[in-house]
Structures are given as C-alpha cells and as structure tokens.
Amino acid sequence: MKQFFLGFLFVAAAAVSSFAQGSQPKLEAVPKVELDRYLGKWYEIAKYPNKFQKQCVGNTTATYSQKQNGRLELLNECLKKDGTMEAAKGEAKIADKQTNSKLKVRFAPGFISFLPFVWANYWVIDLAPDYSYAVIGEPGRDYFWILAREPEMDDATYQQILRRAESMGFSPGRVEKTPQGVETIRGGVLNRT
C-alpha cells in the first residue's frame, strides 16, 4: 500500500506540473533511444529531491527489463536509514514510438492503469552515445534524475550534464547528489562501503 501511495503521489504531482509549465521553453527529448541498450541497471547519481524518495539515503538504482506485452518493467531500489532496502516496481510504456525517448511510467496498481493520471511523463532528455549515462526529466521541470551505468561519475561529465540541463530550464541549484556504496550504522550515520 505504501508503494502505491508513493507512486500515486509521483504521478499526481507530475500531472499537475504539466499544467504549470508557463514560460518555460518547450522541453525536447533526445532524438532516439535504443531500448535494448537502455535496459538493465542504472545507478542514481543525482536528482531533484522529491517526496516519494525522501526515505532513501543512498544506493538508489533503477533496473529496466522488457515485458512480454512490449512494455518495460521498472524496479526502483534504495537503502533506507534503518539499513533495509526498499523496492518499488512500476511499469513504463512508450509514449513516442518513433524515438522511444518519451515514456509514461506508473507505480500504481495495474487495475487502475486505464486512468490517464496514474501515468507520469518520463523523458530521456540527455543520453551518452555509449549509454553510460542518461538524464531524465519531464515538461514541468519538477522532476530530474541523472543515471549512470556505474555508481560514480567523474566531475567533468557531471558538470557538463548540469550545464546542458540548465539550458533546458532545469535548476542545477536544486540537484542533490545521491550517495552510492553506503551502509547504515548505529545512530543512522552513513559510511561508505
């Protein structure tokens, strides 16, 4: 039930944000995503803080796999302060089949998937030619993630991504790095492993 509520909050907020785009320039997704290359495990390098990830303190990953119905399964995992892992399973469908760079994602239960508001925009707005990193955003600029195939990213690449994101209307000052390779110890203090 908790996963449903968190997923519902994400979808509802993303739906509201699409109405509040105002004077932002039109957001463009990358021209093409090869889904076979996009599948697999991604490490969250950084993000805009959001309510549905507030329990996460590090080791956040997203793993994509192909489903038989042509959609993608999304498994998000993160480490919580108490040392346990939290997992949320979602589904993604391709919103733009010519480019594969615009997805609709839901974490709500399948029996309400017919409701449009449970599907949130999830656009690939920057992508390394070798698929070593991907940047995700949505037209309202309320959500933003930097993902990579490795748990660490060199600072030069990270800064270049932030500069490109800023030119698209995202705010680098809101971006928060995600710790990877951490564990919890007594008192909720984090250590790198």
List where the protein language model places each region:
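A beta-rich soluble binding module of mature secreted/lumenal proteins
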Residues: 7, 16-193
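Positively charged n-region of N-terminal signal peptides that target proteins for export
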Residues: 1-4
